[in-house]
Amino acid sequence: MGEGERVREHVRVAVIGSGFGGLGAAVRLRREGITDFVVLERADSVGGTWRDNSYPGCACDVPSHLYSFSFAPNPDWPRTFSGQPAIREYLEHVADTFGLRRHIRLNHEVRMMRWDADELRWEIETAGGDLTADVVVSATGPLSDPKMPEIPGLAEFPGKVFHSARWDHDYDLAGKRVAMIGTGASAIQIVPAIAPEVRRLTLFQRTPPWVMPRTDRAITAVERWLHRQLPFTRAARRGLLWGIRELQVSAFTKRPNQLGLIESLAKANMARSIKDPVLRAKLTPSYRIGCKRILLSSEYYPALARPNVDLVASGLKEIRGSVLVAADGSETEIDAIIFGTGFHVTDMPIADRVVGAEGKTLADAWKDGMQALRGATAAGFPNWMTIIGPNTGLGNSSMILMIESQLNYMADYLRQLGVLGGRVALAARPSAVNRWNRHVQARMERTVWNTGGCTSWYLDAQGRNTTVWPGTTGEFRRETQRVDLAEYEVVRVRGREPVAAVVAPAGVAPGAARLPGALPPDPRASNAGEAEFASGGASNAGGAGVAPGGASKGGGTGVAPSGAGVGEGGA
């Protein structure tokens, strides 16, 4: 080593992101006995999308007792659908309870990561310094980078402009003429929250969403006491919420015509609040319910009926000074513009900063559409996996269930590397990646997302659905329980003979093959009741004691996107 050079820090695993995916990965690593890891977070605190999205009314549209880790149940959720403050507090408690703080590197945005084929490790450049890692777990999530549309004249607009995921709390909306661009999951929360205080609110709607009422309420003190003292009541509540959603899946994936009854209920819900037939016609979708995410709100339609709220059933075409011009030619003078136009879901910006074994970026490898083996590993990117990867999203349930399934896969992947021993990498075979994705896309053909007659953020530039999982969470759990080494090439440092892949013997289901001496999966990984967010709850995985009370603040109003996070909708 030359004078002036320094030895870069090396870790076994580098986790990117500290939302549900990143913190969940960190907990699972500790449970697997792995402490040589870091969590690289670009912001100055943990929380992911629940840190970034703090707009008025921000909340989750999956019930709180299902939208939480099975290994960290919280008996003190304040509401059926808890607000952003409570969810963010829950994630902070997870970081504290499981002793994760010492692993987390705040203000360490990843600038570039490159695979070193000679040393079989990842070289990572961050805003806080460089390091290397044997394995990278990318948990940046699909709802991390806001998408701003290119609108002619936007740069010259003299008023205030911001995205819902970058809410400017210093800007006072009171008495202002405000434009809301988009009618997705963020917008239906923001509109009811700000309508009473603004002078005039103009909502630009390109495509109307289907909206169902939200059955939200405060969780009583008696219920919370029962969940603390009798954990089976909490488990039963979670199990019921999960089971109902599993039973709904077939209507979305196999028999979309069954959704007609739900459409009738949605129309009746609209009619109760919107008496004007002209406005009601503008708000009625022309596509099958479920094709886009079904939104939940009991406040959105009443807000649209307010005298100071206008609906423009057209997209925003251009801006001339302070005048917004819609595609239908209508003009509206505005003081502030709020964009609720979603995120870079199928074109994640971090993909430009991941360079694989062949010198190509992940963005280049995915230029014709994202695809990953079991939603986790990509061909050409050894020892790299993603949490909430391609085709792992859900249309009606909790993304936390999918995250925990992927953590099972991550844990077995690391066990296999440990059993192989030495400096080694697992590289997803292109044939296995293609076979998996053909299987997923074949199942996608009958789903409402592909046949419902809409264009949604689930689809990529080629019109392929690379976002949603076309099955139940139980099916995905089974598909990701084990790593099938037949789907991987085992790579050694050059000059050493590679170890042959282990193929499942006759009679053993794919994915069940084990190398001699491989450890069984940690049975604690997906069982509820491990750590409890309540007074006196015991922690595990080497964490410190659990903070009393848990995430009990902030009920919040409105409903946000489900398991996937917040603000999924487009204009």
Question: Where do the protein language model's features map onto the residues?
Answer:
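C-terminal, flexible cofactor-proximal segment of oxidoreductases
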Residues: W210-P213, E223-R224, P231-F232, A372, ...
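FAD-binding beta-loop-beta segment adjacent to the flavin cofactor pocket
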Residues: R51-C60, P152-G153, E299-Y301, G356-N383, ...
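C-terminal catalytic lobe of FAD-dependent flavoproteins
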Residues: S250, K254-Q258, I262-A327, T332-R353, ...
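Long, intrinsically disordered low-complexity tandem-repeat segments
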Residues: V508-A509, A525-G567
